[in-house]
Amino acid sequence: MPTVDSCVHVFDGTRVEASTLEEPLVRLAASYSKIDRILINEPFSRPDQRIFGNEPPHSWCYYYQKASYYRQKGDWDSIISLYHTVEKQKLIPRDSVEWLPFYAAFVMQDDEQKADEIAAQLRSNPSLVASLCNEWNKAKASLVGEENARLSSHLCNSAGK
């Protein structure tokens, strides 16, 4: 975690979208991550309550991590539903990179207005945007394709909207 206020981030080695607050060694190691080893078609399971206690209240990180999971599946509608929940609860990230699953969902669903709103949040961190654009441009030239091309086109090619 880049800071004590950040959520746990799971990296996709084909497209490293790391926080600008992340440790340099973590950023380097992230490219070796094999996100496809996460079993996305298995049901969620709860840890044993006798050992771990009650589930904590749902904060920003709960929704961010679920949105990241749904992004891996390409389930844009579920991410948008989560976004409306965090919007209603007025939850926001402390690390702007955590907007990415929500941003990706609105871009992929062609919701320009919401994508622009979140892009404005991302643009408040110019070094993050530079890093993301560099990563997406590298990745769109390789295997990952459409999502990277669309994210790059929207955030990187639209000068400051």
Where are these regions (language model features)?
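C-terminal luminal/periplasmic domains and tails of membrane-associated envelope-modifying transferases
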Residues: 1-161
